[in-house]
Amino acid sequence: MTTIWEHCVDVDGEVAASTGCFTTLPIRIHRRNDIADDATKQSIHDWGAYVGDGWEQRSGSSWSPVGNWGAFIFPESLPDRLGVITYLANMGNIHDDLCDELPFEEALKEHSNLSQAMEVSNSDTRQCSKASDRSMKMKKYISKCLLEAMEIDRARALRMINSYRSKWLDVMESQNVNDMQTLEEYLAFRNLNGGMEAFWSMVEFGMAIDISESEKTHTRPLFQAAESALVLTNDYWSWDREWRLAQRTQDPRIVNAVHLFMRTEGLSVDQAREKVRERIVDYEREYLRLKEEFYTQNPNLPLYLRRYVEVCGVITAGNHYWCANCPRHHAWRDEESSPSERSFSPSNEGIEDPRLSPGASTTSSMSQKSSPATEITLSDVLGFMAINDNHKPQRSSDMALMAPVQYIRSMPSKGLRSLMVEALDQWLLVDDPELEQIKNIIDLLHNSSLILDDIEDDSPLRRGLPATHTVFGQAQSINSANFMFVQAVQMTQKLNNPASLDTLLDELECLFIGQSWDLYWKFHLQVPTEKEYLEMVDCKTGAMFRLLARLMFHESSVVSGTQVLQLLDEMCRLFGRFFQIRDDFMNLYSTEYSDQKGFCEDLDEGKMSYPLIMLLWQNPGQRDQIMGIFRQQASNTSRGPTSDRSRLPLETKRYVMSLLKGSDIMASTLRKLRDLEAAVDYSISGLEKALGDANPVMRIVLSRLSVRDVSL
């Protein structure tokens, strides 16, 4: 019979109490504490190797005499996932300890560095000004862990990573704690500051479960009680360390309920700590009461949800036991007896900041508000250059010209191009101004091609929104798309290497040739061979990837040589094939694609996609039927661009899909994609060998598009 507890064991309550621990909840610890210890050791080693600021030694980290923090807070994690999430948790500890000593603005910058590192990773070791940048070091530090998590469980890993960034790093310093007057207000803030939502996503990843939004809503009251106990437990046991640190910091920020009670109620330290202790016990009892009510109201809970609820309490208790014994909160006492080993500057010792006194009314630097991280976008410099010639007519407003541009740019994006730029930059180390210029060039060309593609394909939707030409009309959209090509040329001329402009023109020519064949086959109802199709893809899709890689190669100050350029071209060629065939496959397979562009939209367009080409060549008997459908569709569309005439009937699409599935074409296309994915991975290895640098960032890009977990 399946039980609640699969991976953890009891901790003796009397033994725990003898250490000063006073939790009222049962304590459990993961059986594989050794995995958590190894992950902590690796996290500390990697921080020292990649970041190299010494903080891995100054932070208390996750170890303790009674067990690893990861083994207590992830008690029911699958063993093969425990190491990854403990690594991330220990990284959070080091990062948190570091930020506690930084002035407010520097702490914000440090959060931003780590948040960016969680987006992609870095793997560069070459010595240059860019390689020494802290954000690049952080990317290198975190990359292998992120890649490992994605290889274990890509969907949950991405959810966990995004939550870690957006629900913790991007909000943790965003409020002035000294403005708060009530415990409820403080706990609401600490829920964000402590990253509770991000933490539960890590628990879900570890347990390999998915808790729905509805289930989270129903369990929220009891989880909120447990979270309050968790936060206050940390405050209780960390108070002495935080108070001592604040006396030695130029810009002290105490985020602790003990200080809240001292400040708002005029209590002494001992009185305030005792009040926090009482509240911890109260919230633990509240959790137990609400849990029993929840079970009574929901007697037929699925096992995974009951396990999740029980784990919540065990995490609360395990964290308490660890906090009562961990070096992170208590090692400072040893430092007091060994002044020579202190990691703090002795010059500030004994200085008490009046802002930390009970009842102090002065506002700390926490009153400064953090601004959300924003991605740099195209600046106004992309408009027409001002002409200082009185003999030339004054230019009209560019509002009408730029409206379609701004519309397509505002659409949601999966960020693949930005990820690819980051990945290539781990090898090429392009200086930031030129790198930003190249990003803008690629964005211009990509968005221009989207506008034109939608017009040429008569697509009504783009990323779930009305296509640009359906909002602004075909003529205006074409005009704006053409102007974006002009802007791209203007920006390329400003790059340092003169070869960049020739590269741009070469790849644009290639792109238009590829697109011409795609349109030609559709209009003339001709079926290309697989070889002809791949040649078209190499031109149309591969051109954009090659252009990006070549522009960055030309602007790189650390990489040169024809061999490297050839390897980059080969990787981009394979990546372009993988990307395009995957797009063809997902258009017919993916629910997400249907939501974004419409069900099997490629069939509406009469597009010669890879699966369809394979079907038409391998099953001549069905060729006449499908070509007849396309011929009739083309005839209907030519009578007028009405939505009824441009869309195939749903039944017709389902019939074509039945032919594709019945002929095993979708399965063979998936096999082709997996072969291409392996080939791209092999080409990345070739570049890593040639450049002498591993690049897990590029593998993360590939992993985000992986079809290894796709099943038919």
Swiss-Prot record:
Assigned keywords, A-Z: Isoprene biosynthesis, Lyase, Magnesium, Metal-binding, Multifunctional enzyme, Repeat, Transferase
Domain of life: Eukaryota
A GO term, aspect molecular function: metal ion binding
Disruption phenotype: Does not affect growth and pigmentation on plateculture, nor conidial formation.
Pfam families: polyprenyl_synt (PF00348), Terpene_syn_C_2 (PF19086)
This protein's pathway: Secondary metabolite biosynthesis; terpenoid biosynthesis
Positions with a binding annotation for Mg(2+) 3: D457
Binding positions for dimethylallyl diphosphate per the UniProt entry: R462, K540, T541, Q580, N587, K597, K607
SUPFAM superfamilies tied to this protein: Terpenoid synthases
Residue window of motif DDXXD 1: 96-100
Cofactor: Mg(2+)
Residues annotated to bind isopentenyl diphosphate: K414, R417, H446, R463
GO biological process, one term: terpenoid biosynthetic process
Intervals of motif NSE/DTE: 234-242
Disulfide bonds: none
Subunit structure as annotated in this protein's UniProt entry: Hexamer.
Protein task: Bifunctional terpene synthase; part of the gene cluster that mediates the biosynthesis of betaestacins. The bifunctional terpene synthase btcA converts isopentenyl diphosphate (IPP) and dimethylallyl diphosphate (DMAPP) into the sesterterpene betaestacin I. The C-terminal prenyltransferase (PT) domain of btcA catalyzes formation of GFPP, whereas the N-terminal terpene cyclase (TC) domain catalyzes the cyclization of GFPP into betaestacin I.
Protein name as annotated: Sesterterpene synthase btcA
Organism encoding this protein: Colletotrichum orbiculare (strain 104-T / ATCC 96160 / CBS 514.97 / LARS 414 / MAFF 240422)
